[in-house]
């Protein structure tokens, strides 16, 4: 998609230098941007260095996909300008999540900065300490990467659940930081606990804690031919209110007692 015009607020910004295929050094700048409808990544192939919190206007930008999510790209400074006044009240990045129903997520495209909820209906037995390929970060299976063969893996922490809203479901992944926050323990302590009680007991304890519980999720989603995946920045268990939930079901299905 080309000729994109949009107003955005900068959340963060960084640059990195890399070696291109012809051997020359190139600089790419990128960061997270947002507006009241959500957030995405912005990549600049030009000397553009905004400050977090700045409001900008893009004219003639383009969209590309990175890790399944649409990202904005500008190729020259002529495509972007700084705004002295924001068209909306300053957005707080820590609390900026767009509420989207789980079924809507599964039927839509990949996006960032979303908040959704559902019931945990399954816990993957591979949850806990895993090993990743040092080359591509894929999860190793029996010490082997599907892309790079046998590898000495790098340990990581991952929890994997299935979230369901009664109509649709999605795989939910908690990476190291979000898993540590949810479990209330650092990775080293979790590793020690698994070594002490065993992987099966660890997963069993996790099932007792979350299975059939409602969970609120904040993060990003990726949707492809294999279904929907949620990658959580943070999660929290939601205390159920049976009377209110029963009333909602009765209203939805027009039940009269």
Report residues per predicted region:
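Single-stranded nucleic acid-binding proteins centered on OB/S1-type folds
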Residues: 1-257
């Amino acid at each position: 998609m080309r000729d994109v015009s949009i107003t955005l607020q900068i959340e963060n910004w960084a640059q990195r230098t890399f070696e291109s295929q012809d051997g020359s050094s190139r600089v790419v700048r990128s960061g997270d941007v947002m507006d009241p409808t959500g957030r995405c990544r912005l990549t600049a192939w030009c000397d553009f260095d905004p400050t977090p919190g700045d409001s900008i206007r893009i004219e003639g930008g383009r969209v590309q996909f990175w890790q399944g999510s649409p990202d904005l790209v500008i190729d020259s400074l002529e495509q972007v300008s700084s705004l002295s006044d924001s068209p909306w009240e300053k957005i707080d990045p820590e609390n900026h999540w767009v509420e989207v129903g789980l079924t809507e997520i599964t039927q839509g495209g990949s996006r960032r900065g979303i908040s959704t909820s559902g019931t945990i209906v399954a816990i993957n037995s591979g949850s806990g300490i895993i090993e990743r390929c040092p080359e591509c970060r894929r999860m190793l299976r029996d010490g082997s990467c599907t892309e790079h063969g046998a590898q000495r893996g790098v340990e990581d922490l991952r929890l994997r659940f299935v979230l369901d809203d009664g109509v649709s479901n999605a795989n939910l992944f908690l990476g190291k930081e979000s898993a540590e926050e949810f479990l209330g323990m650092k990775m080293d302590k979790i590793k020690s606990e698994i070594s002490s009680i065993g992987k099966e007991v660890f997963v069993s304890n996790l099932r007792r804690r979350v299975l059939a519980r409602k969970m609120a999720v904040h993060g990003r989603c990726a949707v492809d031919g294999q279904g929907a995946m949620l990658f959580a920045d943070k999660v929290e268990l939601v205390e159920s209110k049976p009377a209110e939930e029963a009333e909602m079901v009765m209203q939805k299905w027009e039940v009269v007692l």
